[in-house]
Each structure stands twice: as structure tokens, then as C-alpha cells.
Amino acid sequence: MDTSSINAQSIFDDNAAMLKLSWLTGHEGWERGFSSESVANATSSADLVGHLNLIHPNRIQVLGDAEIDYYKRQTDEDRSRHMAELIALEPPFLVVAGGVAAPPELVLRCTRSSTPLFTTPMSAAAVIDSLRLYMSRILAPRATLHGVFLDILGMGVLLTGDSGLGKSELGLELISRGHGLVADDAVDFVRLGPDFVEGRCPPLLQNLLEVRGLGLLDIKTIFGETAVRRKMKLKLIVQLVRRPDGEFQRLPLESQTVDVLGLPISKVTIQVAAGRNLAVLVEAAVRNTILQLRGIDTLRDFMDRQRLAMQDPDSQFPGKLI
């Protein structure tokens, strides 16, 4: 990921109000940020933000009551050495939390080295938790996929397929049936956790749906506030295809998945043909996926039933054919 836009200034601007940050000194170092190597080597945002640690240093160092008390108990020589080591790490910025006064030597060294120094009355633990969550969001893997992203029965569903298959028309019909639009045409996905991918609409396309022959439709204005969603977790991908029956698998024996940002997402394929009610089929696919997430697999149950019937046919068909 490009980390050039992530620097002390941008992090301060995004978090100053929530964390009650004040920029004490080191304004000249506003461009300080994270190297691509440090971000690539980080296993989580916890590797980028943490309490003062000179042995295994974090990129953003937070000094709270305990760290300042420890600093005050040191000799002048040890204080100077620790401050020199801290500044030598070249962190994007330092935070003195808990409402304690920043040590004068730290302020002086930050001023001389143009190291941004922030202060806040909030506790160090609260600052670290908030910054870790913030870093995990802005550094999370991202991708933009083509399709219509909808909230169907509380599940995030992405309609995909070749151009001209009627994805937007299908999305419009599903919206008219009470479901919600997240994004049309381009959907921004981000992996915010180990087990889920979240999808949002780009600001430029917010609430808009493009339908051939009708142009752009403002779904929020036409159908109301409840017809749009800000974000949804991606749980199902519905691929629309147009192909002969001979190439279409009616009963797939194995569940289909698509890799999205390293996470397997369930996928169903629906054939587009004249006279088919695609909206009903999509709703049925979503309901079936919900059952599968609850451990109910209709195909597996049928195969088990069939196997039992083959082993003991008389139990299934006690009567005799005449």
C-alpha cells in the first residue's frame, strides 16, 4: 500500500478532536510517516503503535503516567541517554498522554530534531487503542470490484457478470422489493478483520444507480432513506451468466467461493434467460446461504437421504409395485 499520504499531519487532523490532541512542538516534521518496509513487516497495527519501548520500539511511541514516572526516577545521565535513543528511532510522532507535563528535555530534543510531539489529557491506553484501530483501517488491504452491492435480508450481496446482463435492472427490482443499495458499478472493499470484508460506495457515486434507458437514478430520493446503506459486510457473490444449458451445472456438489482480499466468499451462479424471475432466484440464494451459515446444507441432507434409500430401499418404499 502507498503510505506516502499517511504522515503526522494527516493522523493529527483525523484524530485531534476525538483524542483531544495538542501539537506541542516539532511542527517542521509534519511530513514524517511510515516507511513501506515498516508497514509491510507489521503483522498488525499493534506493531505500529504502542507504549514507550526502547528494546522493541514501535513506530508511534506513547508515554503515559508510568513512563513519565519511570523517567523521573532515572539519573540525569540515564534520562539523557533514553531521550537520545527515543529520538534516534525517528518515530512519525510522540504522544505524551494522561495530562502529564512533557519532560523539558524531551520537548527540547523534539524541537531540535523536528520530531512532532503531541499531548493529550486522555489515558495512554485509550490513545493506543484508538490509534491502533485508526491505523488498522487506513492500512487495511483494499480493492475495487465491478458490480451492484446490495443489502438483501441483512446480508451483503454483490451482483457480478458481464456488461449488458441486467445487473442494475436486477438491483432496481430488488430495491423495489424492500432491499437496500450500497453501491453500483464500482464498490470499494476493505478487509478490516481476519474474517470479514466490508464494502462501501465511493463518495462520487453515493446513492446512485445507473439503469440503461433511464440514466442515473437517485435511489435515496426516489425510494427514501431506508433504501440505501452506508456499508455492508460481503457474504455472497451472485454471478449472472448467459450460457447454454449443457455448460451449466445444475447441482454443484461443492460450494463455490471467490477470493476477495485473501478471504473466500461464497458464490452462486445464476443463468440469465428469458422468463426467469431473477429477483426471486437471488432472494432464494441468499436465504439458502443464510441456512448454510447456520449449518443447514440442503444438498448434503438430500444426498444422505438418497444414500440411506439405496442401502435399505424397503424402508423408503414399503409398498410393492403392481
From Swiss-Prot:
GO MF annotations, alphabetized: ATP binding; magnesium ion binding; phosphorelay sensor kinase activity; protein serine/threonine kinase activity; protein serine/threonine/tyrosine kinase activity
Superkingdom of this protein's organism: Bacteria
EC number in record: 2.7.11.-, 2.7.4.-
Co-factor(s): Mg(2+)
Annotated stretches, region: Important for the catalytic mechanism of both phosphorylation and dephosphorylation: 209-218
Renumbered residue ranges of the record's region Important for the catalytic mechanism of dephosphorylation: 271-276
Binding site for Mg(2+): 168, 210
Binding locations of ATP: 161-168
Class in the EC hierarchy, top level: transferase
Signal peptide: none
Alphabetically ordered keywords of this record: ATP-binding, Kinase, Magnesium, Metal-binding, Multifunctional enzyme, Nucleotide-binding, Serine/threonine-protein kinase, Transferase
InterPro entries (UniProt xref): HPr(Ser)_kin/Pase (IPR003755), Hpr_kin/Pase_C (IPR011104), Hpr_kin/Pase_Hpr_N (IPR011126), P-loop_NTPase (IPR027417), Ser_kin/Pase_Hpr-like_N_sf (IPR028979)
Assembly and oligomerization: Homohexamer.
HAMAP family for the chain: HPr_kinase (MF_01249)
Written domain comment of the UniProt record: The Walker A ATP-binding motif also binds Pi and PPi.
Functional note: Catalyzes the ATP- as well as the pyrophosphate-dependent phosphorylation of a specific serine residue in HPr, a phosphocarrier protein of the phosphoenolpyruvate-dependent sugar phosphotransferase system (PTS). HprK/P also catalyzes the pyrophosphate-producing, inorganic phosphate-dependent dephosphorylation (phosphorolysis) of seryl-phosphorylated HPr (P-Ser-HPr).
Family: Belongs to the HPrK/P family.
Name of protein: HPr kinase/phosphorylase
